[in-house]
């Protein structure tokens, strides 16, 4: 009798995706983040669902309802802390996952990569609207500042902003619709993740060498299920430690003050995972230019396959490209730091140089490094 997991229409899909999936035998721990992102998404949806049962999306009661969750709901404090810090873990895994894709040339699977970039944008949108919901000072002013950026769009800008706000300022209508968006987007993300996996399984996984792995593949289960479970345990331990011992480490103290339209916080800044893009936005004095640079900082990932000039896929055997990659990583850390600093010297100049070098490394230096490495690898007989 044939095994049911290989014949049942639904079980067959699960079997071909997570059990009998032929996987390269040499993929490293950098390939763990896909499964970790899946786990993060499930954790966020579940904790979010329980929070939504007690939350009220009304400007008068939103802040109090969050306080009520933390004080009066059974384990509400834990659910809220896991949800808030789970977002940070989600982005940490996302950035490492994207970084892995850049380093090992995974962007050459164009369909998978493009869906991945759209996923990144959707997750960022979800996190932004979610940050507005507790209706603290930073929630309110963050929403005001970021939505206001759309007014830089010529001709329709102001109308568009008022349409998104549902009035002439960030108010009850804005909070209600942001809650609706925050509720629906994770399920859209879930559907897109399925498409992401569908495209990935059309080609199979890449591997650290960037070479064709078809000659040496092993079943996903038990080898990589065990490996993923190890990564899962480490992630959950980190998340729980963060949520229980220092839940407010990554948050903003201003968000403990209820939203007040008459009082602007001294430094308006988003959560840490948006700071790099925020720094790029602030480094351009022109409003429209800043918005375009902000969009370009993420959308530049879409042209990565076009900028690939090397004959090799992975950076594993390309030391010049490796150096540039780690320079880019350091650059992003600097941008993240600058995004959290006040708009004054020397931070303005550092931010501008870091923004210029971010785009220069990706658009100019990396393709040049690929061409140089190609030249150096050519045999030169006397």
UniProtKB/Swiss-Prot annotation:
Binds 2 heme b groups non-covalently. GO terms for molecular function: metal ion binding; ubiquinol-cytochrome-c reductase activity. Heme b b566 binds at residues 97, 196. It is a multi-pass membrane protein. Its cofactor is heme b. It comes from the Eukaryota. The keyword Nuclease does not apply. The keyword Mitochondrion applies. Heme b b562 binds at residues 83, 182. InterPro entries: Cyt_b/b6_C (IPR005798), Cyt_b/b6_C_sf (IPR036150), Cyt_b/b6_N (IPR005797), Cytb/b6-like_sf (IPR027387), Cytochrome_b (IPR030689), Cytochrome_b_C_euk/bac (IPR048260), Cytochrome_b_N_euk/bac (IPR048259), Di-haem_cyt_TM (IPR016174). A ubiquinone binds at residue 201. Heme 1 (or BL or b562) is low-potential and absorbs at about 562 nm, and heme 2 (or BH or b566) is high-potential and absorbs at about 566 nm. PANTHER family: CYTOCHROME B. Belongs to the cytochrome b family. This is Cytochrome b. It comes from Didelphis albiventris (White-eared opossum). The gene is MT-CYB.
